[in-house]
Regions:
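Structural/interface elements that position substrates and couple domains in central-metabolism enzymes
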Residues: 1-551
Length: 551
């Protein structure tokens, strides 16, 4: 039976057959020979997903700083699975396999593929035999087996281990291998390096693998490319030669003149830097959860408190957590450290050592459930039930003004409300498909959907993200402002009620509503609840007191 890979837009691509591999390799060998004749280095990027596709384009866009001529030929390699192969034909025709708000992404990929011809894509991992450098952008996920219990999870190393095995079996001696993936501390030295060393020995290669680590700090949004190319990097290598080579490579492809490299002594230090960096951020956000609840119950507006704290320069980066933190890194990275401490580094006292980081992850993973409680309570105050209520969730992505839905707090809001019997609609100006819902049986991987933690989830596969806010809110009984997208920041209460055709429950997850807007909502007969904004009750009482005094 013919197998196909289907792109997010629904385009079908036939999976390559065994007879096509030799022809594909001949094509790549010809391109590589021509590139070498022009003095170019051959770089293979393993994995052309969220990070790898843009990193491949950045490398392919590199020019020699003396001559100004292109200095790299990049081969983006993706395994030909039904889930991922579609990225290769898209990239081959100059289209980005990842959706990005950054206006630099699409033109850069098109330029490198179609004009400069410094970026090609393939399904054939034999291309590794042509490489001077390999950049590894293969996921190393952390699977949580219980919601709100990070300690029950485990790092998913199999894809990375298989990739490193393939690399060790195929690269030429002297090829630099750079792991760019965020990995459990110790992975480069104690997992990847032994795999490669064993593969080298089986091939009769006496030399040591040249293995390095340098994590990315990619941030989706309008500065997607800059967050990779024009940002500070940390790197290290398994030995002095690997450190020298990775430093040279990164200086050639990144803007290290303005954003200097930090070179660590060992890869475990580079790996730990990324884990601690993200765990710190996750912990600060979790810390604010308790003060958010305190504020709600004691008449305090935490939004104003945070603004006041930001006036102090040392605390200027404090932010309100919203309904969970989301994104690919912050919800999982502390788990990689916790898991590595036992399973890679061999210590048995992890539960005594790691007290704060796991708790922070658990708090962040479950914060969104409180939004469902607030929605229930707001409807109850209007004499309505959450079961059967039409609820509009405004914002599916994990952060403002991007279309990235990975581990968004909104997903848990939707799932919990669905479990409670609500009828859900979703609006988001940036999200075309919410794959965590639409394809929840297989996305992000079979058996990994958050749907397994809730009942009554099958109907969510039919949800489609709406683009017309006025149409989406029509006849809604509740609206949840889940993400501070620009489109939601100046919503007029009169307009909201007019579109809905009735007063409704309004739940603010990010301090989107001003005090005047909250007051107007009450004047229109709405009920308002919000994360961390206990002063709303005071506004409600003042509004009703004023209304009763005028009658």
């Amino acid at each position: 039976m013919t197998a196909y890979s289907v792109s997010p837009s629904g385009e079908k691509f036939k999976i390559p057959e065994a007879c096509q591999y030799a022809e594909e390799m001949a094509r790549l060998e010809k391109l590589a020979a021509q590139a070498r004749a022009e003095g170019k280095e051959i770089v293979v990027v393993m994995g052309v997903g969220f990070v790898g596709a843009v990193m491949a384009a950045i490398i392919a866009d590199t020019v020699d700083k003396t001559t100004g001529k292109p200095s790299k030929l990049v081969i983006g390699c993706q395994r030909p699975s039904t889930r991922s192969y579609w990225k290769i034909p898209l990239l081959s025709r100059g289209q980005s396999p990842v959706k990005a708000e950054d206006p630099e992404v699409d033109p850069m990929i098109a330029r490198c593929v179609l004009q400069k011809k410094t970026l090609v894509a393939t399904f054939n991992s034999d291309c590794l035999g042509l490489a001077d450098c390999v950049v590894v952008d293969v996921q190393c996920d952390y699977a949580k087996h219980e919601l709100g219990n990070m300690r029950s999870g485990e790092a998913e190393m199999s894809a990375l281990e298989a990739t490193m095995r393939t690399i060790g079996e195929k690269i030429p001696p002297g090829c630099l291998v750079l792991i760019e993936t965020t990995v459990a501390p110790g992975t480069t030295e104690f997992v990847a390096w032994p795999i490669m060393k064993k593969a080298f020995a089986a091939r009769g290669i006496a030399g040591e693998p040249l293995l390095a680590h340098s994590f990315e700090r990619v941030m989706p949004g309008r500065e997607y490319v800059s967050s990779i190319r024009d940002f500070w990097r940390v790197c290290s290598g398994c030995d002095a030669e690997a450190r020298r080579r990775v430093e040279k490579f990164l200086r050639e492809v990144l803007n290290t003149e303005q954003f200097p490299l930090t070179v660590m002594d060992r890869p475990i230090e580079s790996e730990t830097t990324k884990i601690v960096e993200n765990s710190y951020r996750a912990t600060i956000l979790a810390f604010l959860n308790e003060w958010s609840l305190f504020a709600e119950r004691n008449g305090v507006d935490l939004i104003k408190v945070i603004h006041a704290i930001r006036m102090r320069p040392t605390h200027s980066n404090i932010i309100f957590p919203g309904p969970g933190i989301g994104g690919y890194c912050l919800p999982k990275d502390a788990g990689l450290g916790y898991w590595a401490y036992k399973h890679i580094l061999g210590f048995e006292d992890g539960d005594q050592v790691f007290r704060i980081s796991p708790t922070a992850i658990d708090i962040n993973d479950t914060r969104a459930l409180h939004v469902a409680e607030l929605t229930r309570d707001a409807l109850r105050n209007m004499g309505r039930y959450i079961a059967g209520a039409d609820v509009l969730v405004c914002g599916a992505s994990y952060r403002q003004d991007v279309g990235d839905t990975r581990y968004s707090g909104s997903e848990l809001v939707v799932r919990k409300l669905t479990e409670m019997g609500a009828e859900i609609r979703v609006h988001d100006p940036y999200v075309e498909h919410w794959y965590e819902l639409e394809t929840q049986d297989v996305y992000p991987a079979p058996g990994h959907s958050w749907s397994r933690f809730f009942r009554n989830q099958s109907g969510l596969k039919d949800i489609r993200v709406q683009k017309d806010l006025a149409a989406a809110i029509r006849h809604a009984e509740a609206v949840i402002l889940a993400v501070p997208h620009e489109a939601y920041l100046k919503l007029d209460p009169d307009q909201i009620v007019g579109w809905a055709g009735q007063p409704l429950a309004v739940v603010d997850c990010f301090g989107i509503l001003s005090d005047d807007a909250i007051r107007r909502c009450f004047e229109l007969g709405c009920e308002v609840k919000a994360l961390g904004r206990g002063h709303i009750q005071r506004i409600k009482e003042q509004t009703r007191s004023k209304a009763s005094g005028s009658t």
